[in-house]
């Protein structure tokens, strides 16, 4: 007879916990808390987390990372000015700021460079990385000039007719002699 009462008490307790405790109406279920990138913890949250609501278990809180912590975990930074064309937007931070992360591929291409496949083309030099194994390649002035049949000179000669076909460096033109069409 005593076992019957114990069985009823255990079943009643399980039913009470699974249906939520009185006074926790409007609280998050564990699934709802997880959907908000949170977790149900007993009373306190882990460091760098904040309570974003109550869970439907008595004494449990729905804890989630702060917007700054979420942004930092995605290797982004919170900026008040918003994201640029070369950034990936990871959503809002506190105070109207945006979580932005520089996209290496967009950044490389935005500045007129190309992403190489394993290595840079002959007339380019690596200046960074688009993705692992794919360098960001910039045209190298002297190498590019040479590949086009030109020479880097302080001044293009006036005696032999030449065209300026590019720039090797600041103030140093890439000169190529004009071909006679004979």
Swiss-Prot record:
It is found in: Secreted. One of its GO terms (molecular function) is toxin activity. It holds the Pfam family Defensin_beta. Expressed by the mandibular venom gland. Its main location: secreted. It comes from the Eukaryota. Residues 1-26 form the signal peptide. InterPro entries: Defensin_beta-like. Keywords: Repeat, Secreted, Signal, Toxin. GO terms for biological process: cell chemotaxis; defense response to bacterium. C(6)C(4)C(9)C(6)CC repeats lie at residues 27-64, 65-101, 102-138, 139-176. GO terms for cellular component: extracellular space. Lethal toxin which possesses an inhibitory effect on direct electrical stimulation of the isolated hemi-diaphragm of mice. Neither hemorrhagic nor hemolytic activities are detected. Phospholipase A2 activity, proteolytic activity and arginine esterolytic activity are absent. Belongs to the beta-defensin family. Helofensin subfamily. This is Helofensin-3. The lineage of its organism: Eukaryota, Metazoa, Chordata, Craniata, Vertebrata.
